[in-house]
Regions:
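Catalytic Zn2+-binding segment of zinc metalloproteases
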Residues: 171-184
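Metzincin-family zinc-dependent endopeptidase catalytic domain
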Residues: 81-174, 260-263
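Disordered inhibitory propeptide/activation segment of secreted metzincin zinc metalloprotease zymogens
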Residues: 4-83, 91, 134-144
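Extracellular/luminal regions of secreted and cell-surface proteins that mediate adhesion/ECM remodeling
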Residues: 211-314
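Second-shell loop/turn segments in exported
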Residues: 72-83, 154-162, 188-195
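Envelope-exposed proteins and targeting segments
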Residues: 67-71, 99, 109-113, 149-151, ...
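Post-HExxH zinc-binding segment in Zn-dependent metallohydrolases
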Residues: 189-215
Length: 314
């Protein structure tokens, strides 16, 4: 009887082990993405605490981004094959996670991001954001969308992790993100091999780069001086959009009649033009002018393309 009970228990134990193994294999076969993409990251108790670092994910400037989704890079020849491969893996991870940002190799002269592997690879310009050893080096600080024009990454002090932790950390800085006070985050000031690219970072990048690049023309100011039947006027036009405004036309209107039009040509993003006209013939009864901007380039908002200016009498 004792032998029979022992055999029954042995059979039950074998069945439990068999089912357990089958269940584990089932999970591995059918849920590989979930096991990899949503792995739990344990806090790193050995990382030093930080001060004056926000608990919230933020950009150096609100809405800071490149004005294009196909971002180019150049890896300096001084970088080893391992350093190049780890950087390429970092680009691939961000590209796969966002599903919208792509990275392509380019010449050193034309690249959006320069990657070096020594402290002397590239000198940082003045008044730029270099967080750690990577970040934007040229920013056009427009009101609506501050634009990253250039970025740099230095990889001379890599952490020996299986994943490209250092490369991802610096790349996220180049994309405009500040440090965050979360030891589990790839953007924490101190690195550990267990850190991950946060879903909040990915969602912010998706939201920013899903916005179609457009121009954004508006009048900074305008003035008009009338003497008799003539007017001298000056207008200051800005483009705060993500792309250049092509074939910009300034129309001058009074009492629903177009008095004249002027070709302002192209206005680059983050740039502006001051345009002045002397001795424009106007009806004597006219006491104001309406200025209207038109362009063939799509804009975020056309409501601010019209401005009315009352005359200053001489």
């Amino acid at each position: 009887m004792g032998l029979l009970r022992w055999l029954v228990n042995l059979i039950l134990l074998a069945l439990i082990l068999l089912l357990g193994i089958f269940g584990f294999k089932f999970m591995c076969i059918y849920y590989p993405e979930k096991m990899q993409a949503f792995s739990i990251v344990n806090p790193s108790p050995n990382l030093p605490p930080v001060e004056n670092v926000s608990n919230e994910f933020s950009l150096f400037y609100p809405n800071l981004r490149f004005n294009h989704k196909d971002i180019t890079f150049f890896i300096n020849e001084e970088c080893s094959s391992q350093q190049k491969n780890r950087m390429l893996e970092g680009f691939l991870i961000v590209s796969n996670y966002t599903e919208i940002i792509k990275f392509y190799p380019s010449s050193e002269e034309n690249a959006d991001i320069l990657i070096g592997c020594s402290k002397n690879s590239y000198e940082a310009e003045e008044s730029v954001f270099i967080a750690g050893e990577g970040g934007p080096t040229k920013i056009i600080n427009s009101t609506y969308f501050p634009i990253i024009e250039k970025g740099k990454i230095l990889l001379y002090n890599q952490k020996t992790c299986e994943k490209p932790i250092t490369e991802l950390h610096e790349l996220i800085h180049v994309l405009g993100f500040e440090h965050v006070n979360n030891t589990q985050s790839i953007i924490y000031p101190y690195l550990s091999c267990e850190q991950e690219v946060d879903s909040k970072i990915i969602n912010m990048l998706k939201e920013l780069y899903s916005i179609e690049p457009k121009a954004e023309l508006y009048f900074l100011n305008a003035s008009a001086l009338k003497f008799g039947k003539y007017v001298n006027f000056s207008v200051n036009v800005r483009n705060e959009g993500l792309i250049s405004a092509q074939n910009v036309i300034l129309k001058v209107i009074s009492e629903n009649i177009q008095l004249d039009s002027f070709d302002l040509k192209e206005i680059d993003f983050g740039a502006g033009k001051t345009f002045e006209v002397s001795y424009l013939n106007v009806p004597s009864r006219t006491d104001s002018l309406i200025f209207k901007l038109e362009t063939e380039t799509p804009e975020f908002d056309k409501d601010n393309n019209i401005l009315s200016s009352n005359f200053q009498e001489v």
